[in-house]
Amino acid sequence: MKAIVKFAFQLGAKIALNPDFIVEKGGRYFLLNNALLKFARKNFYYAGAYLGKVKNGKFFPSFNLLAMLAKGEANKIVVEKKAAWLFICGRDIFRRGILAVRGSRKKGDHVLVLNEFGDCLGFGRIVRGLDEGAKNEVAVKNILDVGDFLRREK
């Protein structure tokens, strides 16, 4: 549970999850409801909403968790259509592709990346202050995007 809260903090978000509904199994975290909690005490592979996993001491969020964080207050950027497509293809975001910034603009901070419709596409790290630099310079380094799953398929 600490890993989830720490990750949310890195994005400038606060997340209020009832620890009674969070189940950890093999380093993977799941958010369950009352009905599922009865069954989850037994052996299970997947239940409820998958929130992410801890591997080698590092937390890897799920897109369920990113979508939850995107609904509230957090560091976010909204990108135009072409930048959104390039981002889900694994590319970084140039300043010229950013339409709006909410929250931190500081170098080194993490941001959620949203398309023009408010869909969370993933997250990245600000590599150059969002108020500085040329429009043709990388502003946000891609860390995780929704296209990752498809790129891993063989």
Stretches with model-predicted labels:
Residues 1-154:
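Accessory RNA 3′-end/elbow-binding domains used by RNA modification enzymes
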